[in-house]
Amino acid sequence: LVLQTAGNLATSQAVFTKLDNAIKLAQERNLHTVPTLYDAAQLVGECLRETTIHAQTIAQETDTKFRSSFILGGQIKGQSPEIYFIYPEGNCIRATTDTPFFQLGESKYGKPILDRSMNYDASLKSAMRAILISFDSTIRSNLSVGMPIDVLVYHNDSLQMPQGYRIDENDEYFASIRQHWSDGLRKILNELEDSPVSYWQ
């Protein structure tokens, strides 16, 4: 299982700690004992909701936002791989053939690229290119988002945690595709037909 988060750092860390402690203390219900990924997502959601309510109760008179969201993905032996988006309220939705991806955090700059280019049948190689361009667009448009980018690719039925890869500022491949993307956009814009005269009246 892989769990990603965005939002209030204290809330996210508290959720991770509670989930980890449940495993270490061999509690009856933890991420190692739940029968399905849906149950795992429900467990994360419950933990998130409890953590948020507790934090808000302590800091009633402040304007601090304690909201965090999570993406849970992975595979349980004998079942299909799944990805769940867990909202700050604790409820969750599953990725489907119609909505094959989720995003966390600052997504408005990169999401249009994924919406235009990605579908359920896309290859992993194509998906990787689109994801990296999506990150590049976000990094260029929002100063609060930056390198590195951590990449983790899970292969169906491997039941093994991937090693993962960290892309930093000196990564040659990332530099190459972001330059190709910028050049390609300018080229396409220059090739588009000029707007009609009526647009300029």
Question: Which residues does each predicted region cover?
Answer:
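N-terminal nucleophile
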Residues: L1-Q201
